[in-house]
């Protein structure tokens, strides 16, 4: 091998060593070694079809739970008093609850530590179904009841949230959060809102209100109908700090196979 060929081989070898070394050497910023930035993790993608799979709750459990949460309630809608007068009170739904004119049912159940670290608890999502509740009232209020064994720890209104879509512990403090949604259909337009909620200390705390996360007007068949949906992602989880949450919004036509395109960041307008 002549000198020119040997020099060319050495040059190529040096370039290869430099290339592979760069794959393993961490960047240094301000005298400190930094790790490559990790991509955001998806907390929930509302573009995906959601299948409701609520847990089956034995009738005996339902009766026990509802009996602890409500002093009086009805077992059937047919027993509602059609002459119930709540027009004189500022909150007709509260008037119905106070009168025992409710037909409650358990929508879902979850287990975890919801009010305090290390406590084993069962959370029940309840549809109160006040007898006078209309479509405008989302057919009644929704509540969460949390039990530790037989002890009722919390009984709080959840602002019409009717579904649990994910249980998390984002800051690793041992207290679980819930991503909850509420939906409504009006004139063929489906609207869904979401919030990340916790019940620390037996009180409701809204960690993040995401606002509208789904707006689908396809069923209305109006000109220009479309489907809009949000993707909620989070920065790297570094306990005990709550990760930063980010909303990205997408839109698609009304075809069966959706082709989503990015439209905005932040809460959907």
Question: Which role fits each region the language model picked out?
Answer:
Residues 3-14:
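Bacterial N-terminal signal peptides that target proteins for export
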Residues 18-19, 25-93, 186-269:
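Acidic, small-residue rich beta-repeat scaffolds with periodic aromatic anchors
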Residues 90-109, 156-165, 213-228:
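Repeat-based blade/solenoid architectures
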Residues 99-101, 130-138, 156, 184-189, ...:
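Short consensus segments that form the blades of beta-propeller domains
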Residues 113-127, 169-184, 233-247:
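Acidic/hydrophobic-patterned starts of short beta strands in beta-sheet-rich repeat architectures
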Residues 139-149, 194-202:
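Beta-propeller blade signature
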Residues 150-158, 202-209:
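Blade-edge beta-strand/turn elements of extracellular beta-propeller
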Residues 158, 162-165, 172-194:
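Eukaryote-skewed repeat-based solenoidal scaffolds used as protein-protein interaction platforms
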């Amino acid at each position: 091998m002549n000198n020119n060929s040997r020099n060319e081989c050495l040059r190529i070898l040096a370039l290869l060593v430099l290339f592979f070394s760069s794959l393993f050497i961490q960047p240094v910023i301000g005298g400190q070694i930094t790790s490559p930035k990790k991509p955001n993790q998806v907390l929930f993608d509302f573009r995906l079809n959601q299948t409701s799979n609520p847990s089956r709750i034995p009738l005996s459990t339902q009766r026990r739970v509802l009996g602890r949460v409500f002093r009086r309630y009805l077992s059937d809608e047919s027993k509602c008093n059609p002459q119930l007068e709540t027009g004189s009170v500022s909150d007709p739904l509260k008037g119905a609850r106070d009168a025992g004119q409710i037909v409650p049912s358990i929508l879902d159940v979850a287990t975890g530590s919801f009010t305090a670290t290390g406590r084993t608890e069962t959370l029940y999502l309840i549809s109160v179904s006040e007898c006078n509740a209309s479509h405008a009232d989302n057919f009644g209020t929704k509540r969460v009841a949390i039990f530790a064994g037989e002890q009722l720890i919390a009984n709080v209104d959840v602002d019409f949230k009717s579904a649990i879509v994910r249980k998390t512990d984002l800051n690793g403090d041992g207290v679980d959060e819930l991503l909850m949604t509420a939906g409504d259909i009006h004139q063929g337009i489906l609207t869904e809102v979401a919030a990340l909620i916790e019940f620390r200390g037996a009180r409701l705390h809204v960690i993040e209100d995401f606002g509208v996360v789904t707006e689908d007007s396809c069923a209305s068949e109006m000109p220009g109908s479309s489907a809009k949906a949000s993707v909620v992602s989070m920065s790297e989880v570094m306990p005990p700090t709550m990760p930063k949450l980010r909303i990205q919004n997408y839109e698609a036509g009304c075809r069966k196979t959706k082709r989503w395109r990015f439209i905005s960041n932040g809460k959907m307008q």
